[in-house]
Amino acid sequence: MENKGRESYEILLAVCKADHLQLTIGYKQMRDLLERLCRLHMHNGSLQMTDLSARISFVAAKVGLSVAEQNRLHTFRLTSNAILNRQQEPTREHLLRDAKTLAFFIRKLFEEDIPQELYRLLPRTDATYIVAPPAHKQVQRMRVCFQYSDERYLYVTPLDEIADEPLRVRYNIPQINEEFAETCQLLWRHAQLNLLDVAVDEAGTLTPSFIVLEPDYLIDISSLAECYRDYGHHPANYFLSRLQPIENARPLLLGNIANLFLDEWIHAEGEVDYLKCMQKAFRRYPIELAACADLRDREKERQFFDDCKLHFDHIRETVNDTFHAAGYELDKTDAVLEPSYICEALGLQGRLDYMQRDMSSFIEMKSGKADEYAIRGKVEPKENNKVQMLLYQAVLQYSMGMDHRKVKAYLLYTRYPLLYPSRPSWAMVRRVIDLRNRIVADEYGIQLRNSLEYTAQKLEEIKASVLNERGLSGRFWETYLRPSIDNFQEKLKSLSTLEKSYFYALYNFITKELYTSKSGDVDYEGRTGAASLWLSTLAEKCESGEIIYDLRIKENHAADEHKSHLLL
């Protein structure tokens, strides 16, 4: 440890002696030094904190830094963010101020005096920082670090500004954020939160509409929506889907072929030949078609290809007729197929089937059945499909700045066909994000504890008595819904003690790997995981070879049927 302290002082001394042209490089070296120091003092902990702000808060609590000392470190963090993102020009005055902050931090960590040569270069006055005054305003998004809570408030520290004391966040407020009551019971110290649509009163108290736990851990929208089942929407549904094999590949295969049909009709200038489309489907999905057990039965095979023709005709009718009908006004010549979205604000990712280029309208296509029984004589969208549409509307608002009230969202059930307009419900979106938070908390707990007993306890929740939140009974529940849930527990209970231990250990390992692949790993220098896309600065991406920029497309052959390619 003594060598670490001496090496750290030597780095600071070299930075302070560098000339004016090296200020940005100096900030990069000091930033890397702070990252290493925080990781060094978190090495024995299992906390999965990939954000520097959270690491500073953790180490500060561990070594007993005062609020003023913490704020000086956060001031350096924010200044280095701005400089490394090319939003601010570095000055020697600020560099020496921040070098002094790091020097005193090193002294605290290693209990080793600052060398005289370095001390003489540091400013005599204490490092100062600016505390943003509270204002009566509305903030769209704030990233904060959770510290503790009481019956009325969550106490958090902001990541993008400096505060003398934790900010207060009002929670469980009726008609505003009461949907996140369960989320707030699951928080742990230093957890990262995104607060969305935040009202700030004159006392500086925050009242957010959304509370998103660990937003760097992205959950797939379709997987989250599938948690909404006929019998309830418990978080364990997410883990049940992950652990269940696909028993019937036929609906999935039909959906893929229907997407191919949509692609053909959108890009077609005239009529599309059905047989040529099916030949293309066979070329694209040869193994899936050959391996599908249902298609080995002659009657089911005939029904499958009859369904393909039905969906083909319905998609043609929708694209050629319904698109141009009054009230829809969809233009296939100005559309994007299968655009993908990453929404750090909500901790979600997903892919749409069809979207107008100006994002004014989008379509999510379903080849399965809608709800034919909720209202007699009327076809209604299923709850999981409505949830999926709501989440896409929320993603467009918080990622692309599109007001959800101005975006037309449609569900296309190609079986009927039915192009159903989706109506936004922000209270429902809040409930779904609360469910997402509970899933993330479960994932975090499993990878943090890495305990066979804890994992066994969590997987024990995957049973009919827990998942059947609506208390269904009768023939439909017993014949069609319950067996798939019971089947998992029966298989688990049939394992020997050794087999169970192996399964739980492997499950823990995969969960840990999945968590680090998304949020990153504190054991490595630099940023890792998918979250580095928005957490890393441009300079960090360039240095690690993760980005090539200033490229121009010379020839675009991406839509070519054979050997699609781009020339840059």
Regions found by a protein language model. Give the residues of each.
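Structural motif
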Residues: 17-29, 226, 244-255, 379-383
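Mg2+/Mn2+-dependent nuclease catalytic core
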Residues: 158-188, 332-437
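Charged, glycine-rich intrinsically disordered N-terminal tails and low-complexity linkers that flank
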Residues: 142-145, 168-170, 174-293
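Accessory interdomain/linker segments of ATP-dependent helicases and helicase-like nucleic-acid enzymes
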Residues: 113-159, 453-567
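Short amphipathic alpha-helical face segments that pack within enzyme cores
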Residues: 28, 32, 253, 257, ...
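Amphipathic alpha-helical interface elements
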Residues: 1-122
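N-terminal intrinsically disordered, low-complexity, charge/repeat-rich segments that act as generic
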Residues: 52-64, 71-91, 99-102, 106-109, ...
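A non-catalytic, helix-rich entry segment at domain boundaries
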Residues: 261-337, 483-523
